[in-house]
Amino acid sequence: MQSIGAKILAATKERHPNHHHPRLIMTEADFARLREKRGEGAYKPMLDKTIAEADKILDLPPRKYEIPDGVRLLVTSRAVLTRLTHLCYAYYATGEEKYAARAVVEIEATVNFPDWHPRHFLDCAELCAAIAFAYDWLYDYLSEDLKAAVRAAIIKNGFNAVMEEYNNEPEHKNVLDPNRGYRWYQDKPGDNWKMVCNGGLTLAVLAIFDEIECDLCETILNHAYDDTYEAVRKFYDEQDGTYSEGVGYWSYATRYLSFYSSGLQTAAGSDFGLTDWIGLARSPYFLLSMSSPNYIGFNFGDAVESKITSPLFSWCAARFDDPALYAIRKKDILEGKSDFVDVLYFRDVPEVPLKDMPLAFGRPKADNATFRTSAAPDALFAGIHFAKNNAYHGHKDMGTFILNIGAKRFFVDLGMDNYNLKPYRGCYRFRAEGHNTIIFNPSPENDQAWEAGCTTDRFFNCEDYGFAIADMSAAYPERRAVRGMMLDRPSKSVLIQDEIECKTEDVIRWSAHTPATVSIAEDGKTAVLDMDGTKLFAEILTDGVFEITLGRADENSPVVQPAPRESDPTPAPQKDNEGISRLFVLLSGKERHRIAIRFTEMTDAEIAPAEVKPLSLWS
């Protein structure tokens, strides 16, 4: 029986005999189509921007082999990928040799690197993708000597290097090369590295396999396909499309999955079922559900606060016959926010309205829940995150929440920090104290348990309101903590309620981070948050009073600057949280606490009184 790798190689040879190129995502017909479309509709700003970026590259020196943080060549790898893809497209679009000639300079520099830094294999994989695209798209322009040099570099720096990963089984970890870092192939279920590394190496194989004497090609394709096939089915939840690493890493992982799948399609005529997965098809709607009315995502874990409407929406539109996703991406393109990946996938087709999105997202046993008052641009939107703290790219953030009124985010997730911090898990943004949740006895030692996890226990939504409840006790040893979020649509309010069992001497701190201007009433029971005239009314419905750390949320944190270590006497500073205030409530002296805090959008309507019910009676 033929292996999947053998099938891919045979199909590619049949479709592209006599070393025919281009065959990686872009074909001759695709480049011709873009030349014809260059002045039309949304194609014009997208393609004009791509050529303008290529023009900027012409006078730049080629990238050097530099590892500025001592860990990653990744900045160079990504720059090479960006440069080569832009230059290649500009050459096809204009026919001007200056773009191809400048690409040759970049290729020559890259193939002469001492290696492609397999110790941090993402660096190697992204360079494999970059050089594969350039070799394929410029095949008829490159000299025979340079093509031979490219093939040799890919074999040495890519194929031989990846076999160290594929051959090094867990029981022999680091035997072959003890200097390797993260063992992404052995890691199960793993993370975005599987898409990037397997995808980059597959592109490299497809670019050169028919011109080399190398018995590794089939082996690499076999390992890459099997590993990625499994990862797709674990990373993209079958029920609702939730991506396991959150909204930020969805784009990175799916970008390389799209390269992998589309490269197989144009080379071999099929991706052999790699992306035939309903969870992947549903994943753009996970992003839409996890974003505010202006498409800014809920950036829990290692993510930044940014728009979720990436170029991969266009790939999903084509792959899963969902043209409504093109329209979402088109808005960004018309605003001048295109990316080179748009060139690969975007189609300016007649707009199809997005299917009606539910006003709530979640279910029992899910990691996240979101609610909104309506589908309008000025709607109130709130989201809450549970999940496993030690998930890939997770933080100690169980129970954290965000809240928007329209485009204004009143309660924020501070997002990721510098991965080179030592220890990263000790930085403010990683710890529970840097999130919108509760902690007991604030100190460097006391936070949420790293190994803890939970999912939604109860989820409900109807016309007027919706709620999600989860038991977070696993995060707090020897304590019990249950948190609920309820959004009430008629009153435009969000209730965060915690029910806690603890020790009498425990100090509980409830916190939420905000960029708003905050005014606390004299009695401390209410506060008004103001963002450029849009106001949110906060009220404590139970014990406690509001306090605030103004303008610098982490000011009283004992871990804002990690202590230097002998191996790193000058650690990188943590990111600046200037301009973010921490609104908090401190409670102590009892074994049982109920903390109910309601946030209501301030309008001309009178704010109705609230009733506090035990979470067990929410229905």
Locate each region found by the language model.
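Long, repeat-rich segments with strong aromatic
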Residues: 221, 225-268, 369, 373-375, ...
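Well-ordered alpha-helical scaffold segments within catalytic/enzyme domains
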Residues: 21-40, 81-97, 109-117, 127-146, ...
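Solvent-exposed loop and edge beta-strand segments that line ligand/cofactor-binding
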Residues: 23, 63-80, 112-125, 167-196, ...
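Terminal accessory carbohydrate-recognition/targeting modules of carbohydrate-active enzymes
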Residues: 2-18, 22-23, 31-33, 363, ...
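Carbohydrate-active enzyme catalytic cores, enriched for enzymes
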Residues: 182, 208, 248-411, 461-464, ...
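Low-complexity, Ser/Thr/Pro/Gly-enriched N-terminal "stalk/linker" regions
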Residues: 2-68
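Active-site lining segments of carbohydrate-active enzymes
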Residues: 64-71, 132-246, 344-356
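CBM-like, beta-strand-rich accessory domains located in the C-terminal region of large
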Residues: 417-619
